[in-house]
Regions:
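A conserved acidic beta->alpha catalytic loop
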Residues: 24, 39-48, 64
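Glycine-rich, basic loop-to-helix element that forms the pyrophosphate-binding segment
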Residues: 61-79
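Short aromatic/hydrophobic "clamp" motif used to bind/position activated sugar donors
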Residues: 84
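Conserved donor NDP-sugar-binding/catalytic core segment of glycosyltransferases
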Residues: 95-128
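Short, flexible, basic/aromatic active-site loop/helix in glycosyltransferases
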Residues: 133-169
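A short, conserved alpha-helix in the catalytic core of glycosyltransferases
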Residues: 162-164, 168-189, 193-220
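Active-site-adjacent helix/loop segment of glycosyltransferases
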Residues: 202-205, 209-254
Length: 254
């Protein structure tokens, strides 16, 4: 495999997690990989820390908190890669997942986007929606307990599929998205109407209109998922706003 791969992390005061994300990605990746950091106006020293400790990483200051999708879109004109990875600042890897996912796309030209298995740092699987969000799925996800996933959540997360091999999904989590760069550019990156949340659902749906989105449970990344919007009222309102924009867009789109 001789493909060029780019990756981007959008940060906003993420100095507590960004070092592990960047260091593990650079240490484990053997492919031709270029990493961008787009900083959305951090005041905790995040961009300075990256510049001082990781000179091989390209740091771009957006000039303010432009949001998740808009931050990622800032670098689309700079990309000359074959594949591109959208990465959360609280992701870490323990092996060469970048090369594995690139090899999967090499072998499956009908797939435009691949999503890996996501686990908590302690190894526990994260239950993430893989079907297109609807109100009953979102309600089940928001109010789920700590025990076994009930029927609706199992359906949303497609937990009854065969996890011994990759399978098609409707919705890929935005914490780690591996996509063909040409396709990402063709779609114009993320839809600019979402400041944060639901931009991954929207991108997944756009990709599925012209290609395939696949979940690959044979490749694993680790995510320090805190579900901030459950505790922070401002983020909760942003989440609701994005949800309404998503439903409005896809209800009336032909």
């Amino acid at each position: 495999m001789n493909k060029k791969i780019s990756g981007c992390i959008v940060t906003y005061n993420n100095i507590a997690t960004i070092d592990k994300a960047v260091s593990t990605l650079l240490k484990c990746t053997e492919s031709d990989f270029r990493l961008f950091i787009v900083d959305n106006g951090s005041t905790d020293g995040t961009p300075e820390h990256i510049e001082q400790n990781y000179p091989e990483v390209t740091v771009i200051r957006s000039g303010g908190n432009v949001g998740f999708g808009a931050g990622h879109n800032l670098i689309t004109d700079r990309l000359d890669s074959d594949y591109h990875v959208i990465i959360n600042p609280d992701i870490s890897v323990r092996d060469d997942v970048i090369s594995k996912l690139a090899a999967y796309l090499d072998e499956n030209p009908d797939v435009g986007l691949v999503s890996p298995e996501v686990r908590f740092p302690d190894g526990k699987p994260q239950i993430l929606g893989k079907r297109t969000p609807c109100l009953r799925y979102l309600f089940a996800s928001h109010f789920r307990g700590k025990g076994e996933a009930e029927k609706t959540l199992r359906e949303y997360a497609m937990l009854d599929e065969d996890y011994s091999k990759p399978f098609p999904i409707e919705n890929a989590t935005g914490c780690f998205i591996f996509i063909r760069t040409e396709l990402f550019k063709k779609l114009g990156g993320f839809d600019k109407r979402y400041f944060m949340y639901f931009e991954d659902c929207d991108l997944s749906r756009e990709v599925n209109r012209i290609s395939k989105v696949v979940y690959n449970p044979l490749v694993t990344v680790y995510h320090e998922w805190h579900r901030e919007s459950k505790r922070n009222m401002k983020l909760k309102l942003i989440h609701i706003s994005s949800m309404l924009k998503f439903f409005a867009k896809w209800t009336f789109r032909k």
